[in-house]
């Protein structure tokens, strides 16, 4: 007998939100790990708000806010407005964030108002560090052998906004038309973006000059997990300076100044001052030798070792993080402005990448055990 096309909505349901999420859904393990990291941030998140004795209306739980920001990265949602629209009807999103089926959806400006608070208290950086610490406890990191690299991030600003620093529009609105820079010599010394003052006009290799930032990551060679991440203004020295800062932090985290550490990198890091800096930190520089019309700063006795060959093979894992961040995480062109905001978004994206990668590695171990 043919059924009738009718719809009768029940006024009550006896099912929990948890029941709608498949038992083997990837987000289950990701949420579990993210919550373990957030649990360690209690004092930091509490310090972000006024003491309870002062009264006032309770804020949106910062843990829920951070989980929502993770969702935006994991599912390539373009904007907070679109994210809130999807949370309204997506039960999976509600479950991950921690909203019940009846909870009201936030207005998108919640993210704008809380972003500065998260930056001020380094909440995203501390969350990233807790995720890395969990990976270390699961024996997913070597803690000794690393690779470093940088990538260009297109700023949320165009060429038309890149004008002379002393450029002031006429009272009558006259002057050169916006974006009419043909025949002009433009540089970061004389020009700046009115849309994003921290962005820099930069090109690398055969790429076109664009307003950009530069993202840097330090990856652990065991499984390619990101051990450190940061964003700087784009210039020719940023990669090496960021690498020195990140490997110095890794040395301090190791807690043993005499323990051997290695650092793999491409030819762009083959500079005497960088190699000397690594040596001074007792880090063996497994940097690709650049012998194009010059002598490499990397000693031949290092370049001929088996460890050097292994580092050169393993350093390619770092590209997986950049690839994921640009195709899934939306870092190819950021939708925020200012160095601090771009850095926050980049670090959060790398934390999300680690969560996804750790979940995959956990599945591999589980299958191997079976």
Give, region by region, the residue ranges found by the protein language model:
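Basic, low-complexity intrinsically disordered segments
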Residues: 2-5, 30-140, 155
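Charged, often Cys/His-bearing segments associated with DNA-binding zinc-finger transcription factors
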Residues: 1-37, 181, 358-370
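Secondary-structure capping and boundary motifs in well-ordered enzyme cores
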Residues: 22, 26, 56-64, 79, ...
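C-terminal extensions of enzymes
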Residues: 330-370
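Arg/Lys-rich, glycine/proline-spaced intrinsically disordered segments
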Residues: 52-57, 291-298, 365
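Polybasic low-complexity intrinsically disordered regions
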Residues: 88, 97-277, 353, 359
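Helix-centered, glycine/charged polyanion-binding patches within enzymatic domains
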Residues: 167, 171, 177-178, 267-340, ...
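Secondary-structure transition/capping motifs at alpha-helix termini
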Residues: 75-81, 93-94, 102-103, 250-259, ...
